[in-house]
Amino acid sequence: MDVLYSLSKTLKDARDKIVEGTLYSNVSDLIQQFNQMIITMNGTEFQTGGIGNLPIRNWNFGFGLLGTTLLNLDANYVETARNTIDYFVDFVDNVCMDEMVRESQRNGIAPQSDSLRKLSGIKFKRINFDNSSEYIENWNLQNRRQRTGFTFHKPNIFPYSASFTLNRSQPAHDNLMGTMWLNAGSEIQVAGFDYSCAINAPANTQQFEHIVQLRRVLTTATITLLPDAERFSFPRVINSADGATTWYFNPVILRPNNVEVEFLLNGQIINTYQARFGTIIARNFDTIRLSFQLMRPPNMTPAVAALFPNAQPFEHHATVGLTLRIESAVCESVLADASETMLANVTSVRQEYAIPVGPVFPPGMNWTDLITNYSPSREDNLQRVFTVASIRSMLVK
């Protein structure tokens, strides 16, 4: 994997900097590194593909070295370099694709394709190493079963979940009370509602709670907490739990009271925030508990009182909500996030070449399925294919 990254980094630099008119002295170190890559690869043969519709390709290396010059690089020099660069880039691209479409239930962190296994040989250690990639650093740590740490922006840690629970219900569905939520990606939105606006509740107050368990521990997380759930702020028709009918939800938004958010790790509270909105932090956690209240306004203007009558029919439904958004966090496991395209890169290659479903990943690389059942085998394989995808993205956009 280190060699593949170093190849890709060398080729990217060469493609960007070996251009007509450039002073040789400005790229002499790069050309020396480029020539070392050629010397190391010359005389070797590789084969990629042969799975799904990914075609078998044979690769043979026997390229001449780039020479020295006292002047600027001319068109002939650059054309010679380009022919070599293009072949190497095509090779790296195919090695990456060959690796991204393979999986293994055992030791999935290790190279799975013949070509990448061959590049792990001692001969190729002479290629200049560049381990500045976070993915490469963590792949090396995971390969040695040491602790890893990925920094994510808006990590996709929450499997998609959208539903509701009713604490009070009737066959007519005309006086309901309960919670509804949408968990997806890095965001939780939860709303508590009471058609009667807590008219008969103790102290005219309804208590709501929403607990979300993460599939992996997050650390040093920066989080946004807002006293609103905009996705539940407009009327909608909702299917009943048994699917026999539908019911109407017509929210009128109130501000939640006594808001508390707890971050827990193995059942122990690590951080607690009460009535604090905006940016908060959490040290480490695997569970989030949100609690909040809907309180009937003690004083109402006639217009507000008309919204919340003391008896049925209740045409407007008192609603309070919260939004919790994980802006950034560190996780020992690899995740999809908002700042990278690794999941899309891997998935698109597997779809394009009709790769058959293997023993580890779900069909279509369904992220909700993958993260819901995030086994050690899936974690190893995902880290490997994401690392390869990060290498490929240096050369192929």
Curated annotation (Swiss-Prot):
GO cellular component: viral envelope; viral intermediate capsid
Recorded GO MF terms: host cell surface receptor binding; metal ion binding; structural molecule activity
Principal subcellular localisation of the protein: virion
Binding site for Zn(2+): 153
UniProt entry tagged with the keyword Signal: no
Maturation and modification: The N-terminus is blocked.
Note: The VP6 trimer contains a zinc ion located at the center of the molecule. The zinc ion is not essential for either trimerization or transcription activity of the DLP. Zinc-depleted VP6 has an increased sensitivity to proteases.
Protein name as annotated: Intermediate capsid protein VP6
